[in-house]
């Protein structure tokens, strides 16, 4: 059976968008262990939790951002399936916008750094093909909503 994890692709919009549609910035966290990879906040589902409850709890634990500081974007849910530590893993992501552009990020010990990044920079830091793809799909979804 695959390990199951859930997370939020957190983003904010610059107050003054640039002409090239780089107004969207994604929050990525750098892991403290392993290869120090960059991902959105995510974590394993605990007994009795729904997937979305897990994503919200993990965001609060890993980035210090509470559910009340976020707006979940309807219509976007992506499932990634891959092998991690020689075990199959499923991760489900939703898009969530911070209500305050200057929201304070408070990292847990699981992470050593965070960055707000435009799509191209976020994809450069995201080392895994699946993560890059979900960031691109999320960005495309958000841009299509604005059109």
Swiss-Prot record:
Note describing how the cofactor binds: Divalent metal ions.
Residues in Nudix hydrolase domain copies: 2-139
Cofactor list: a divalent metal cation
Signal peptide as annotated in the record: none
Residue(s) carrying N-acetylalanine: 2
Keyword GTP-binding: yes
Record's catalysed reaction(s): P(1),P(4)-bis(5'-guanosyl) tetraphosphate + H2O = GMP + GTP + 2 H(+); a 5'-end CoA-ribonucleoside in mRNA + H2O = a 5'-end phospho-adenosine-phospho-ribonucleoside in mRNA + (R)-4'-phosphopantetheine + 2 H(+); a 5'-end FAD-phospho-ribonucleoside in mRNA + H2O = a 5'-end phospho-adenosine-phospho-ribonucleoside in mRNA + FMN + 2 H(+)
Coiled coil: none
Tagged with keyword Aminoacyl-tRNA synthetase: no
Keywords: Acetylation, GTP-binding, Hydrolase, Nucleotide-binding
E.C. code: 3.6.1.17
Enzyme kind, highest EC tier: hydrolase
A single BP term in Gene Ontology: AMP biosynthetic process
Highest taxon of source: Eukaryota
Pfam family name, one: NUDIX
GO terms for MF: bis(5'-nucleosyl)-tetraphosphatase (asymmetrical) activity; GTP binding
Residue interval(s) of motif Nudix box: 43-64
Stated regulation of activity: Inhibited by fluoride ions.
Family statement drawn from the similarity comment of this UniProt entry: Belongs to the Nudix hydrolase family.
Function as written in the Swiss-Prot or TrEMBL entry: Catalyzes the asymmetric hydrolysis of diadenosine 5',5'''-P1,P4-tetraphosphate (Ap4A) to yield AMP and ATP. Exhibits decapping activity towards FAD-capped RNAs and dpCoA-capped RNAs in vitro.
Protein name: Bis(5'-nucleosyl)-tetraphosphatase [asymmetrical]
Species of provenance: Sus scrofa (Pig)
Lineage of the species this protein comes from: Eukaryota, Metazoa, Chordata, Craniata, Vertebrata
